[in-house]
């Protein structure tokens, strides 16, 4: 069970969900190259009668599900990577920029969210240094972050190597039986994977995004001009990672953007992404035409100092691509894309994001902020899928990827959007070819436009498919997509839906450890171990509540049936009866074989004895 509690006495401190998931405990595995690292995983125990070991699963929930760790939202999480970062000797602390009124949308008085109580001096690269995981990987250095993610990806499967199965179609991905730190280094060095890990976010537990690793999911949170608060957004972040979000994007667009982000980053054990353009727009009063490179640059530095791990940069929206969207059914649906398109048309020139991209790289290089190159011209309806505007921008994203790589910056590429099923694979194939196998990060895609209120399902279908084809991270869609700002329950539904999609993709790709949890749950289902079924599921609370709606008594959790079929029509119970009967017949047949030969085995068919003796003969 989880509880929601404020971790200090201050009434302004947000209450967050804590406590372990059912039958689960946090375990840690230590490093070999870097013995100081402790990699978290979740161990799910099963009933002793099963005679099976616990199941180990990936766990991005941080200390919030570990009852042995005391957390304080006002203090933030432990800075576990700080010593790793400073030990490399290539960073320096400095005072950083001062927070200005425009950083929080000019909010004052009661409308101003309190500053995060603890302020550490930000770090940046020393002059001439690149402090990115890509730079280290290219230099042949295996960082603690690289060993951390290698251990994390394996999920203890080195203990299961004899039982693992490679069953799937990987479409060119090269998933190893065992992930080594050197394999991680090589994937990062070649740009096929990224480890989003800003040097000013030492609280984060390293994770990796790449098609040769587990498929990851992102959850979006953030306030708007009309709804939500700091307390709600911090709880949404904690709630999202509790259910399996690997990264979280803060897409706040209202007031208090700076202070809300500080509270989120300081308490986030996962990478945090943003769209800096949103805050830059707030700084100029929401007027796109008034945006400047200077305002945007200041916003990048502000967020890099806070510890944002990856930026969505809509630098691929070029002036001559905008006319390609005129005949679309839904035009330009990306907020960032529409802002930059409006700016370009007003000023009759290329965007400042495109013109100053090399300078953006210099900033990201100094803090190890990864690029998430935005798809500002993504299709917003299936009618617009795979059109000239979408693929023209993708070509530019490929060009920008090479520029970023030349600056030692980590890069992933954002993708659509709304794409019918038969057009999905073309998106993956083109992205791999154009962007040099940089990780693909897609929103869905939604496979049909007819289901407002159910777009977590329409997009989950596309997400599972494109994840199978090679997408490295899937951005979740909630039931509120196109309708409103998601609340806490919407966040959970979106995360669970996308955990299903990501896991289905891992299974289809033939990930060597993907089936372990499935098989454990299937055995529990066949053996009517109801509690194990609940606990091994992605959402134990919902599974248990659905079962208990019709069979609420504890005795029902020992029953060999559920309310769907009842005791007489349960297929698995009937299968048990068939298996028992077959076993009985087999024993009777064996007895017949031995009867004629005594201790010396003589096949019954050779002795003339009947294979199935009558019942009175066995009495």
Swiss-Prot record:
How the cofactor is bound: the record states: Binds 1 [4Fe-4S] cluster per subunit. The cluster is coordinated with 3 cysteines and an exchangeable S-adenosyl-L-methionine.
Gene name, per UniProt, is thiC
Spell out the family assignment given in the record's similarity comment: Belongs to the ThiC family.
| Top-rank lineage group of the source organism | Bacteria
Instruction: Tell me the pathway.
Output: Cofactor biosynthesis; thiamine diphosphate biosynthesis
Q: What does the record give as the organism's lineage?
A: Bacteria, Pseudomonadati, Pseudomonadota, Alphaproteobacteria, Hyphomicrobiales
Q: Give me any GO biological process, just one.
A: thiamine biosynthetic process
Residues involved in [4Fe-4S] cluster binding: 562, 565, 570
Tell me which Pfam families the record gives. ThiC-associated, ThiC_Rad_SAM
Polar residues composition-biased segments: 1-11
- Give me the residues that bind substrate, please: 220, 249, 278, 314, 334-336, 375-378, 414, 441
Which keywords does this Swiss-Prot/TrEMBL entry list? 4Fe-4S, Iron, Iron-sulfur, Lyase, Metal-binding, S-adenosyl-L-methionine, Thiamine biosynthesis, Zinc
The record's EC number reads: 4.1.99.17
Q: Name one GO molecular function term.
A: 4 iron, 4 sulfur cluster binding
Q: Where does Zn(2+) bind?
A: 418, 482
Q: What is the stated purpose of this protein? A: Catalyzes the synthesis of the hydroxymethylpyrimidine phosphate (HMP-P) moiety of thiamine from aminoimidazole ribotide (AIR) in a radical S-adenosyl-L-methionine (SAM)-dependent reaction.
Q: Which cofactor does it need?
A: [4Fe-4S] cluster
Q: Name the segments for region: Disordered.
A: 1-25
Q: Which HAMAP family does the protein's record reference?
A: ThiC (MF_00089)
Look up and give the organism this protein is from. Mesorhizobium japonicum (strain LMG 29417 / CECT 9101 / MAFF 303099)
What are the annotated GO cellular component locations? Answer: cytosol
The question of whether Metal-binding is a record keyword is answered with yes
Keyword Ubl conjugation assigned = no
Write down what this protein is called: Phosphomethylpyrimidine synthase
